[in-house]
A protein has these predicted regions:
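Short, well-structured segments within or immediately adjacent to enzyme catalytic domains
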Residues: 1-202
Length: 202
């Protein structure tokens, strides 16, 4: 499906990006845009002075054949699953596919995970009592509880110039005003979980 850099609000208020075959390969199977949006998301977008609901909160694991060139921050040491046979040989029950994304972190349709880092790129949603929906390559879906208070706070932190959720956390720098990349000296159990379920070494 089509998407855009997350500060282009118009791209996230247009259901055609989800249901028009011109923009979305899933369009012939999924006719209803509402399936892409978690009902718990109450956020709105300012599009030309009008506030409208965001049409999508779910994103797809970027290691499932994400191919957007320069926008691809996937670690080349890890497998980019291009074929179903790639998935079948690598424990599909442990590989996440779609994930409920923090409303302030929704961007291109991919959910990127930095594999060898203490930094979040995209952030999971915590709207269901610190939990979010995660689907897996074997077809099962579960409500996954995120355990770190830093993850809970980060899911609602909008700008990289704002205060860190915890005084022990530091902004990683680089002037990234679009994605908050927070580092923690001790790591984050939720980030580790994402890394363990996003891909495997080649």
């Amino acid at each position: 499906m089509a998407g855009d850099w997350h500060n282009n609000n118009q791209a996230f208020g247009n259901p055609d990006y989800l249901t028009d075959p011109q923009f979305a390969l899933f369009a012939s199977y999924t006719k209803i845009a509402a399936i892409y949006r978690c009902p718990a998301d109450r956020s709105t977008l300012d599009v030309g002075g009008s506030f409208i609901p965001r049409v999508r909160t779910y994103a797809l694991n970027s290691y499932l054949n994400w191919q957007l060139g320069a926008m691809n921050d996937n670690d080349p040491a890890y497998l980019n699953f291009r074929k179903s046979s790639d998935v079948e040989s690598r424990h599909p029950s442990d590989l996440f596919t779609f994930i409920d994304t923090s409303p302030v972190s929704v961007c291109f349709p991919a959910f990127q995970v930095q594999m060898v880092s203490y930094a979040f790129f995209h952030r999971p949603s915590v709207e269901h009592n610190h939990s979010g929906t995660v689907a897996f390559a074997d077809g099962h879906v579960e409500s996954h509880r995120w355990t770190s208070p830093q993850t809970w706070d980060l899911a609602h932190t909008v700008t990289a110039t704002g205060p860190s959720p915890d005084p022990n956390w530091l902004h990683s720098g680089g002037g990234d005003g679009d994605h908050i990349r927070i580092i923690s000296g001790g790591g984050n159990p939720d980030l580790r979980w994402l890394q363990q379920h996003a891909s495997v070494l080649k």
